[in-house]
Amino acid sequence: MLNIHDLTLIYPDGTRAIDSLSFALGKNENIALIGENGAGKTSLLLALAGVIEPTSGSIEINGLSFTKKKLNEVRKQIGFVFQNPDDQLFMPLIYDDVAFGCRNLGMDECEIETIVDETLAKLNIGHLAKRSSLKLSGGEKRMASIATVLAMSPSVLLFDEPTAYLDPKAKRALVQALNNLEHPKIIATHDMPFATQVCNRIIVIQNGKIMKDGDLSLLTSEELLKKYGL
């Protein structure tokens, strides 16, 4: 599904955000990417989403390598939900936010309407279609931001701190929504209870390196969590 091999990312100022990192995401896997602030989680997601180009190493999804020539094709297979929902909600109405990517691809408006309606229904937010994001709660914004990504039919979903800005009720709705989505997921999070509810694999990152990779039992080790600032 998604294979990362010997990935390294060094920023212009010399910061080594990702350091020779390798792992694979399987078809039925939901990975919680955990680590203290500055560990490299967001940098990794940005590289996997094709937003920034790694210094070296390789990324492959469904047999397709991330190269400049194929980058647009690759990006269609990766859905990236940013930490701040407002980064993906900038149109007058939620309907237009969700339709935005489809329109950029030149899809027929009738087809777009069907896709938007089905996507919003899948997340139980059809009632938000004709509303502005400026009038939505944090939880509603989060669901709408996910819808903008789902409408593009990605193969893999990436999330950067999806529970940020959410109250307990909104978190419960998010857990239910993510568990209903069959897409493999990589979720960067500091929210351990949330991780146990939506993920079946844990990767601990520190200084851009994978320190631990295993099942949910990793989250029961107080010594491990303390060691890596979690």
Each model region followed by its residue ranges:
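Helix-to-loop junction immediately C-terminal to a conserved catalytic motif
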Residues: 49
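Conserved ABC transporter NBD signature motif
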Residues: 57-66, 74
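Conserved ABC ATPase "signature" region
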Residues: 110-128
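Conserved ABC ATPase signature
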Residues: 132-136, 140
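Catalytic Walker B motif of ABC-type/P-loop ATPase nucleotide-binding domains
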Residues: 157-160
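H-loop/switch region of ABC-family ATPase nucleotide-binding domains
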Residues: 189-190
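Conserved beta-strand-loop-alpha-helix hinge in the C-terminal portion
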Residues: 209-230
